[in-house]
Amino acid sequence: MIAGGTGGANTVTGKWFEVKTDLKTALTKAGYDLTNFQFCRQYDFPSLFKTKTGEKMEDLFGKKFLPDEAVIFNNTLYVIEKKQQGGGGSVDEKIQTGPYKLAIYQECAKRMGLANAYYLYLLSGDYFNVPKFTKHQIPYLEQFGIRTYFDQLNLAEIF
């Protein structure tokens, strides 16, 4: 992100994409009972991790990890990173970090007493659903079990 908050989710389109793709709203509209879902976003996740483990993320991993959305359901941690892009930029390379972040969140899940962790990307289709990504980067992510979705999650497939 650029100093002063002009990149990432601080852009108008980035914030709009995050609101448009809100997980809790999508689950509610799809008729899911949210009783057994525990939701958190960005800065809430390190606090949840510390509450469940007594450990600070930055002490274990050198920094806090701030997922766009995370949910615990059925003894599993689901981390959803959302990327919206209107033109070329650093987000092109950010999705390549998925395998590293998956390993971090799997360790978080283990320490939180959860059975597993999944790392998912929710990408804006108008930018990412093109051969540049679908022929190279997305198959690479899939090798690690990282699922990618365009514009909306397939809730039935995930939950």
Mark where each language-model region is.
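Nuclease catalytic cores
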Residues: 1-28
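Hydrophobic alpha-helical packing residues
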Residues: 23-34, 141
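Charged, structured surface patches that assemble and position nucleic-acid processing machinery
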Residues: 136-159
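Acidic carboxylate-rich catalytic motifs and surrounding loops in phosphoryl-/glycosyl-chemistry enzymes
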Residues: 38, 124-125, 151-154
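Conserved long hydrophobic alpha-helices within structured protein cores
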Residues: 33-42, 92-100
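Catalytic cores of nucleic-acid endonucleases
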Residues: 77, 84-136, 140
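Active-site metal-binding core of divalent-cation-utilizing nuclease and nuclease-like domains
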Residues: 34-74
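Residue-level detector of short coil/turn "hinge" positions at structural boundaries
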Residues: 34-36, 116, 148
